[in-house]
Design a protein with these regions (language model features):
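C-terminal lobe/tail of nucleotide-utilizing enzymes
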Residues: 196-298
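A conditional alpha-helix N-cap/helix-loop micro-motif detector
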Residues: 19-20, 115, 186-190, 218, ...
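Phosphate/Mg2+-binding loops and adjacent switch elements
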Residues: 95-208
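P-loop NTPase motor core
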Residues: 49-106
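Walker A/P-loop NTP-binding active-site region of P-loop NTPases
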Residues: 9-72, 129, 134, 138-152
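Switch/connector loops and helix/strand junctions flanking conserved nucleotide-binding motifs
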Residues: 47-50, 77-81, 142-146, 245-247, ...
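Extreme N-terminal starter segment of soluble prokaryotic enzymes
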Residues: 4-8
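Short, well-ordered alpha-helices that flank and scaffold nucleotide-derived cofactor binding pockets
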Residues: 28, 32, 124, 226
C-alpha cells in the first residue's frame, strides 16, 4: 500500500450504544486491509479488553498484523501529566507563592486535569506515531463533551492567567528580576491548548456518532450532534443494534429525517450475543459500508 496521510477516526455516543465494539471492528477491518492501525480507548471504564478478548494491560499491545491496541487509565494519565507538566507547574506556582514540589500532586488531582491531558496525549500520538490511522474510542457522550469543553475553557483561562501573573508579580518586578520564564511557560500552555483544539477540528479527523434506534438514544444523539459539532467534524452516524422492529423503524426514519444530508448514515444489525473477539468483529461491518468509509477517510 502506498503512503497515506495519517487520519483519526473517532467514535462518540452515550454509554451502552456499542462505541467500543464498532471502533474495534473498524480497527480490525482496516488492519486486514493493510493499513497500520492504532486503536485507542480513552474510556476509563474499560471494555476494550472484553470486546477483543485480551488481557487488560497498561501498555500498548500488538494484537495482530497492522494493529496495536492501547487502553488508557486514569492513574496512568495522572502519572504522565506529572512527568510532562509537573515541573513546569511547580516553576510557575513557586515564582508567585511560597510552595514546595507537593503542589504538583495537588494540581494533578484538580478537576479537569485528566480530561485535558487525555486530549493532549492523543494529540501527541497523532503528531508522533508512525501509523496510517488512529481509531479512537471515546468516553461516553457526557464525559466526552466535558473533556472538549474543559480544553476550550483551559485555553481561554490561560489568556487571563498571563494578566493575573503580571498583576501579582508586578511588571516592574519582572523587568528588574528578568523573571520571564513563568510567563513563557503559561503562554506555551495556551498555545498548546490552541493546537489541541485545532487538531480536533483538523480535516484529518473524522468523527463518528454512534447510537441505537430507540427514543432516548435518538434524543441524546440529536443533542450530542449539536454540541459536539462545535468541537469536532462529525462525518458519520452509525445506528447500531438494528433489528427492524416496529418501534425501531419509526426511529430509523427519524434519524434519516434529522441527519440526511448532514452525515453519512450506516446501519449495523443486532448480533446476539454481542460480538467478542477478532473473528466475531470481522462480521460486524459490511464490506459495502467499509469501502464507502475507506473512500472518504483515505
Amino acid at each position: 500500500m502506498g503512503m497515506v496521510v495519517k487520519r483519526v477516526l473517532s467514535f462518540w455516543g452515550k454509554g451502552g450504544v456499542g462505541k467500543t465494539t464498532i471502533s474495534s471492528a473498524f480497527a480490525v477491518a482496516l488492519a486486514e486491509r493493510g493499513y497500520s492501525v492504532y486503536l485507542l480507548s480513552s474510556d476509563f471504564m474499560p471494555s476494550l479488553h472484553d470486546v477483543l478478548e485480551l488481557p487488560l494491560t497498561y501498555e500498548p499491545v500488538k494484537v495482530m498484523d497492522n494493529l496495536v491496541v492501547e487502553q488508557l487509565f486514569e492513574d496512568k494519565i495522572i502519572d504522565l501529566w506529572k512527568k510532562r507538566f509537573g515541573d513546569e507547574v511547580y516553576r510557575v506556582a513557586s515564582s508567585i507563592f511560597p510552595v514546595g514540589p507537593e503542589i504538583i500532586d495537588y494540581v494533578a488531582g484538580a478537576p479537569g486535569i485528566v480530561e485535558e491531558f487525555t486530549l493532549y496525549y492523543i494529540y501527541e500520538l497523532f503528531r508522533n506515531l508512525t501509523c496510517d490511522i488512529i481509531v479512537w474510542d471515546t468516553v461516553a457522550t457526557g464525559g466526552g463533551l466535558r473533556m472538549l469543553k474543559i480544553e476550550k475553557e483551559f485555553y481561554e483561562h490561560l489568556g487571563e492567567a498571563v494578566k493575573l501573573y503580571l498583576k501579582v508579580k508586578g511588571v516592574l518586578d519582572k523587568i528588574r528580576t528578568g523573571s520571564e520564564e513563568p510567563l513563557k511557560l503559561i503562554d506555551s500552555w495556551r498555545l498548546l491548548a490552541q493546537d489541541v483544539l485545532s487538531f480536533l477540528k483538523n480535516a484529518s479527523h473524522f468523527a463518528t456518532l454512534v447510537s441505537r434506534p430507540f427514543p432516548i438514544d435518538f434524543q441524546v444523539a440529536v443533542r450530542a450532534y449539536q454540541e459536539l459539532s462545535q468541537f469536532v467534524p462529525i462525518r458519520f452516524l452509525f445506528i447500531n443494534m438494528v433489528s427492524f422492529s416496529g418501534e425501531e423503524k419509526e426511529y430509523l426514519k427519524k434519524f434519516e429525517e434529522t441527519f440526511e444530508g448532514k452525515l453519512d448514515i450506516f446501519r449495523v444489525p443486532r448480533f446476539d450475543p454481542s460480538p467478542r473477539g477478532i473473528n466475531a468483529l470481522r462480521k460486524l461491518i459490511s464490506e459495502k459500508d467499509l469501502e464507502k468509509i475507506e473512500s472518504i477517510v483515505f
